């Protein structure tokens, strides 16, 4: 078996990726989230496939087909809530994974990092089109508001919006194409994830110390397979607690009402994992400015390798940047909270301050902290 594992054309790839892969001996539990994202993607594809067998992407029957899945299909309620809450777990793992990359300086593996940003954007697109499918009030109005933002693009904006809608409003054509996108995108994510791994294994993993670990590597299996298995069990436990005890805690009550173009909900808001970006979008009074800020709130991650001038890898021995990092995380939580609040004082003001701080920390404060820390190093 050992010889076959190392010589067989297909098994050889699996062997070099998951079994005999030389891995730093000191990577902590923060490195578990990559494998957890893989598991989340598998759960989403499997549950999504079974949901697609019973779902109908027609404005007249979409809402009732979801109700039918929950009521009449064997374990349909379980599949549906695994899929809905699985998306939340996916994003929790995604945010922690990106946060770990920022904290430990993994962005210096620039190809892996850039593919990761593409993965992040693709996952956000998938979640957005997926949220439209149940055709509840928030699905419909969320789709209307967010797709309408494209009209802010000069000259081609309005044409682009109508092209995406497939008509003059969000209707049957929109729902149909969103279902098609939602079905295909996870497979594109899976393909990008393989490229992500390919680039990662080209350079080898980073580690908490930020030092070169070539002299101290251990095989991935059994050490990290067991460690990942523990993470997977914890993830599944949290997911099952959510699904079986609090299935609707992260959903919006408005989505239990069928979509009605004549009745606008009091507060239109996306799922919780988009609220930080939604708060940044709303904090700018100008439509085009808001759209640009929304896009930049994600694309700004690409500036991390460019703006980093530190002589050290990661933040483990950099107290000033460490403080900034945790202020950044707190600010992100504030933005998430603001995104779910109505557009009125004091929420708008807090949102504007938090949005400015979001960009200021990354573009101005962190590079300054880098220079200060480099100078402190020279003193010693």
UniProtKB/Swiss-Prot annotation:
InterPro entries hit by this protein: Cyt_b/b6_C, Cyt_b/b6_C_sf, Cyt_b/b6_N, Cytb/b6-like_sf, Cytochrome_b, Cytochrome_b_C_euk/bac, Cytochrome_b_N_euk/bac, Di-haem_cyt_TM
Gene Ontology CC annotation, any one: respiratory chain complex III
Gene Ontology process terms (BP): mitochondrial electron transport, ubiquinol to cytochrome c
Membrane topology: Multi-pass membrane protein
Record-annotated membrane-spanning stretches: 33-53, 77-98, 113-133, 178-198, 226-246, 288-308, 320-340, 347-367
Cofactor or coenzyme needed: heme b
Protein's UniProt keywords contain Ribosomal protein: no
Places the protein is found: Mitochondrion inner membrane
UniProt keyword Oxidoreductase present: no
GO MF entries: metal ion binding; ubiquinol-cytochrome-c reductase activity
Cofactor note: Binds 2 heme b groups non-covalently.
Residues that coordinate or bind heme b b566: 97, 196
Name of one Pfam family that matches: Cytochrom_B_C
Signal peptide feature range: none
Entry binding sites for heme b b562: 83, 182
Sorted UniProt keywords: Electron transport, Heme, Iron, Membrane, Metal-binding, Mitochondrion, Mitochondrion inner membrane, Respiratory chain, Transmembrane, Transmembrane helix, Transport, Ubiquinone
Family: Belongs to the cytochrome b family.
PANTHER family the UniProt entry points to: CYTOCHROME B
Function: Component of the ubiquinol-cytochrome c reductase complex (complex III or cytochrome b-c1 complex) that is part of the mitochondrial respiratory chain. The b-c1 complex mediates electron transfer from ubiquinol to cytochrome c. Contributes to the generation of a proton gradient across the mitochondrial membrane that is then used for ATP synthesis.
Other noteworthy facts: Heme 1 (or BL or b562) is low-potential and absorbs at about 562 nm, and heme 2 (or BH or b566) is high-potential and absorbs at about 566 nm.
Assembly and oligomerization: The cytochrome bc1 complex contains 11 subunits: 3 respiratory subunits (MT-CYB, CYC1 and UQCRFS1), 2 core proteins (UQCRC1 and UQCRC2) and 6 low-molecular weight proteins (UQCRH/QCR6, UQCRB/QCR7, UQCRQ/QCR8, UQCR10/QCR9, UQCR11/QCR10 and a cleavage product of UQCRFS1). This cytochrome bc1 complex then forms a dimer.
Protein name listed in UniProt: Cytochrome b
Naturally occurring in which organism (per UniProt): Oxymycterus iheringi
